[in-house]
Amino acid sequence: LDHVLKTGSPDLRTRMLQEVAGLFLEDAHRLGARHVEVFDDILIRLTESVELRTLTTLSRSLADLHLVPRELARRLANHDDADVAAPILRRCECIPESDLIDIAWMRAEGHLGAIAGRKAVSQELTDILLMRGDSSVLRVLASNPGADMTSAGLAMMVDAAERDEGM
C-alpha cells in the first residue's frame, strides 16, 4: 500500500481503491467491527490521492450500506465537493447526528439540500436548514415527510412559503 501511494500512478491508485472498495462491498455484511476499521484505514489512505469522480462513485456505493467505515463516511460526507458528499449525506444512516449538525452549520447549499432529503431529519437539523438554506433547500425540506419541525421551524417554513411561489 505504501509503495503504491508513494510511487504508483493515479490510475494504479484508482484501481487499487476500486479493488479494495469492491472487497469491502462484497463482504461488508459479514465483517466484524475490527475488519471494518482495517478497511477504513486502508480506504482513507487510498482516497487521499484519487480524482473527484472516483470519490463520487465510492460515496454512491457506500451510502446505502448498514455498516460503513466510520471515518471514511465522515470524510466523504464533509468533502468540499457536494457531489461527493451528497450520497452519504442523503442516504447513509450511519452518519451521527452530531456530524450532520456540524456539516449543516459549515457547508453550503449542495450539502444542505442533501441533508434536507434524508429519510428522517430531526427538529434540530430542520431548524438549522431553515436558518441557513436557500429556497431550493427549503423546497426539499418542505416536500420531505420525514422532516420533523418545531413550531418555530414551521413558522419559518410558512414565512418562506409566502415569499416563494414554488414552495
Task: Provide a role label for each language-model segment.
Residues 1-167:
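Alpha-helical scaffold segments
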